[in-house]
Amino acid sequence: MTDNGTPEPTAPDTIVLVHGFWVTPLSWEKWVERYEDRGYRVLTPTYPGFEGGVEALREDPSPIEELTFPTIIEHIGGIIEELDKPPIIGHSAGGVLTQILLDHRYGAAGVAIDSVPAEGVRVTPVSQIRSLFPILKNPANRHRAVGFTPEQFHYAFANTISREESDEVYERYHIPASGRLVWVGATANFTPGHQENYVNFSNEDRAPLLLIGGSEDNIMPPAVNQSNVKHYRHAKSPTDHKEFEGRSHYTVIGGEGWEEVADYALEWAVEHAKRPAA
């Protein structure tokens, strides 16, 4: 009971983790184990067509080529609809998907980690341009699944760890990404009308949101994350921001000390997802 005699709010028992581009739900494996050890049910929904996993998508990337933001939202949203409004935690493209899902009234709270920018975020640092250049250098990549080389992955994702360690991460997790969706994100602010990555930043019915970034992230640098946060400045629903020093795009969710980020995200999400007791 609380001090005024009302029942304590109930905390959620299920967490949904949404992966980003260039990886699959396997990228959450450490977080899943940690959260399950704490008694939570953890779901890691994949994108439509990704059911075969890393090796299958490397051999046949056609499901990647066919992706759209709406089909991903419909797929993951359908899974969340069957749950009792869980917290949603997303990384990279999973971060902007989390923002879109909250805007569509899915989830009781959301954490967007190293988020791909939503439509309207116009900051484009040099390191981000360099990271995405392998995809954006050729307009024909809009119709392809495009991967990174190990060298490109090290710069874009894992620049705070050794090349040897980065190559191990690459071998375990890396798959091609949808060139189309990368281009959607890159051109959204120059295309008339709302695009697939649109979020209503002033949505009064949105659940609480935390945006997390890494100070050394090259592909989604701090300036991008900070600009994304500022777009929520007029929102009535809680919107918080946390930046972790010394962390790159990968080492926010993996690498030494990843537990600090995982625990912070979980504690924030669970606290803000609590509902009044029945």
Residues covered by each model-derived region:
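Active-site glycine-rich loops that stabilize anionic/oxyanionic intermediates
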Residues: G20-V23, S92, S215-E216
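Helix-rich cap/lid subdomain of alpha/beta-hydrolase
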Residues: Q128-P176, R180-L181
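Conserved hydrolase catalytic core segment
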Residues: P87-V121
